[in-house]
């Protein structure tokens, strides 16, 4: 293990932008809320043997802090407030909030503590897990192989898009959490930066160092936590949407739709929300069906879909993104976030399908009932039933 003991992470900003966006909102609105989150491997990988190495990395994370140049850079962005950034300057990861164990070969990780602190663990911890596992499993793989794979795919992409008007095609890097390594992600992003259709990255550290636009708004946990923050479960999604607009009335206005299925979301997404939010993000279910529902919803509300943006980010690769672009580009603005298929795309390397999801808020259960049943997460069957009833979802498949 000592050969891999060097810290994977070197910057507090080596995380997804929406984590800081949500953290500021939590800091201002829900300072005393406590949460718990758990790690899941959606594949059949037995990762428990890496528990000691991961625990070592968790301990090392307590030494990360916001540097002065990072603080100055964040201060220049239009949506961060001084009180939050001054607090973030003093923030340190607390390893006592994380338990890591080997449960008969299964990697068991649980996070708990104040939401304002726990919220920052997910993305860097997943990136650590991914990089540590790949260091052990694929020591022969390197950056050059990742770059070669990308170059070949860009040749195919050029052939696929020949003669196609690509002026409305916008691609973002969403690859931090399941990257092969920090070095691979940086190399891939630098190469993509040479393409006119590449518009930014979700990684704040890379955005700062490479002068890119940071991309991201909110994640499932924002909606999940409101299931216990809101006094009325049936109103929890609307409460989450409203609270976000309080924090960011004119910015970061892409709403995630699948915490409790797209249909349930659209019932809550009335004309005021639809007018004020800049667009929607797809993260599960059939993307064409989802996009058609979104466009139809805007039209029903009397809103021109051309004034809104649909962001696709579920298991995309370049070919899928082009297919969706061909289908929708004449009717709505589009952006595509690609993660694993860019930052962990190396021959003979199997990417990890890993997540960390909220399971409790203030000691009570929360759930994610997405448009892909395999992505559903909740321990408490009674709460899932209550959630289905509150959102009129009698036929949704059982939580796993």
Curated annotation (Swiss-Prot):
- A Pfam family matched by this chain, by name? NAPRTase_N
- Which EC main class describes this enzyme? ligase
**Reactions accelerated catalytically:** nicotinate + 5-phospho-alpha-D-ribose 1-diphosphate + ATP + H2O = nicotinate beta-D-ribonucleotide + ADP + phosphate + diphosphate
Q: Which GO terms describe its cellular component?
A: cytosol
A molecular-function term among this protein's GO annotations: nicotinate phosphoribosyltransferase activity
The EC number(s) this enzyme carries: 6.3.4.21
InterPro entries xrefs: N/Namide_PRibTrfase, NAPRTase_N, Nic_PRibTrfase, Nic_PRibTrfase-Fam, Nicotinate_pribotase-like_C
Q: How is it modified after translation?
A: Transiently phosphorylated on a His residue during the reaction cycle. Phosphorylation strongly increases the affinity for substrates and increases the rate of nicotinate D-ribonucleotide production. Dephosphorylation regenerates the low-affinity form of the enzyme, leading to product release.
A biological process term (GO) from this entry: NAD biosynthetic process via the salvage pathway
Q: Which residues carry this modification: Phosphohistidine?
A: 220
Q: Write the record's keywords in alphabetical order, separated by commas.
A: Ligase, Phosphoprotein, Pyridine nucleotide biosynthesis
Give the source's domain of life in one word.
Bacteria
Give, as in the UniProt entry, the pathway in which the protein acts: Cofactor biosynthesis; NAD(+) biosynthesis; nicotinate D-ribonucleotide from nicotinate: step 1/1
What does the similarity note say?
A: Belongs to the NAPRTase family.
* Task performed by this protein: Catalyzes the synthesis of beta-nicotinate D-ribonucleotide from nicotinate and 5-phospho-D-ribose 1-phosphate at the expense of ATP.
Protein's name according to its UniProt entry: Nicotinate phosphoribosyltransferase
Please spell out the taxonomic lineage of the organism that makes this protein. Bacteria, Pseudomonadati, Pseudomonadota, Gammaproteobacteria, Enterobacterales
């Amino acid at each position: 293990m000592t050969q891999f003991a060097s810290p994977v992470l070197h910057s507090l900003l080596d995380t997804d932008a929406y984590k800081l966006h949500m953290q500021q909102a939590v800091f201002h609105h829900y300072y005393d809320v406590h949460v718990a989150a758990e790690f899941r491997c959606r594949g059949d990988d037995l990762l428990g043997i890496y528990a000691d190495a991961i625990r070592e990395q968790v301990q090392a994370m307590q030494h990360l802090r916001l540097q002065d140049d990072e603080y100055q850079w964040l201060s220049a962005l239009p949506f961060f407030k001084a009180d939050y950034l001054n607090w973030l300057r003093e923030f340190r990861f607390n390893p006592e909030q994380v338990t890591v164990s080997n449960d008969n070969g299964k990697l068991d990780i649980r996070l708990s503590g104040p939401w304002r602190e726990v919220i920052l663990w997910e993305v860097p911890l997943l990136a650590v897990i991914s990089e540590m596992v790949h260091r052990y499993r694929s020591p022969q793989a390197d950056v050059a192989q990742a770059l070669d794979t990308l170059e070949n795919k860009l040749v195919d992409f050029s052939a696929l898009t020949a003669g196609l008007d690509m002026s409305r095609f916008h691609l973002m890097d969403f690859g931090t959490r399941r990257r092969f390594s920090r070095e691979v992600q940086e190399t891939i992003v630098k190469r993509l930066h040479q393409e006119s259709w590449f518009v930014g990255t979700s990684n704040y550290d890379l955005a700062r160092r490479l002068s890119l636009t940071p991309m991201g708004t909110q994640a499932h946990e924002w909606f999940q936590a409101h299931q216990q923050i809101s006094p009325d479960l049936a109103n929890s999604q609307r409460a989450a949407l409203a609270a976000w607009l309080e924090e960011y009335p004119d910015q970061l206005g892409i709403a995630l739709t699948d915490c409790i299925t797209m249909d349930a979301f659209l019932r809550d997404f009335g004309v005021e929300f639809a007018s004020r939010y800049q667009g929607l993000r797809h993260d599960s279910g059939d993307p064409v069906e989802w996009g058609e529902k979104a466009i139809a919803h805007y039209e029903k509300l009397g809103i021109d879909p051309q004034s809104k943006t649909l962001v696709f980010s579920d298991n995309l690769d370049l070919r899928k993104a082009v297919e969706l672009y061909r289908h929708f580009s004449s009717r709505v603005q589009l952006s595509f976030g690609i993660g694993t298929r860019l930052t962990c795309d190396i021959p003979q390397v199997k990417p990890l399908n890993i997540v960390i999801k909220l399971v409790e808020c203030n000691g009570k259960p929360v759930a994610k009932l997405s448009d892909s049943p395999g992505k559903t997460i909740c321990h408490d069957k009674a709460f899932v039933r209550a959630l289905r009833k509150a959102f009129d979802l009698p036929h949704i498949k059982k939580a796993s």
